[in-house]
A protein has these predicted regions:
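Charge-dense, helix-prone N-terminal extensions
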Residues: 1-122
Length: 122
């Protein structure tokens, strides 16, 4: 069961974060990026998929905040089904965690990773 307007609620928050852009996702839905890095994507009003480093993904799954990815369970990706109003808030929190991790490695001047940011400072 999908939550009415869940994707719009998520989008209205995520696009307020500095540097975040939205694109059509290749498998449907909306993909959010910081530079070239995908922060996650939303499939309609029912599912959010978010990439994390494997260690972080294991913590998130162990805490019951999300499930292993619905198609690629042995990767760093997690899936969160939007079934209850609190799931939208949890999706935003997890997308924010992905954003915070990506932001540490991103330079708006370079639009790329930490090495580029370091080189720009030299």
């Amino acid at each position: 069961m999908a939550l009415k307007d869940a994707s719009m609620q998520i989008q209205s928050i995520v696009l307020e974060w500095p540097g975040v852009t939205a694109y059509p996702h290749r498998f449907g839905g909306v993909e959010y990026r910081l530079g070239a890095r995908e922060l996650g994507h939303v499939h309609g009003d029912y599912l959010v998929d978010i990439p994390f480093p494997t260690r972080v993904r294991e913590e998130i799954v162990a805490a019951g905040l999300a499930e292993p990815h619905h198609i690629l369970p042995d990767t760093g990706w997690v899936s969160l089904y939007l079934r209850a109003p609190g799931d939208v808030e949890r999706a935003v929190e997890l997308l924010r965690r992905s954003f915070d991790l990506a932001r540490r490695k991103w330079s708006p001047a370079q639009g790329q990773g930490a090495k580029d940011a370091e080189n720009a400072m030299e």
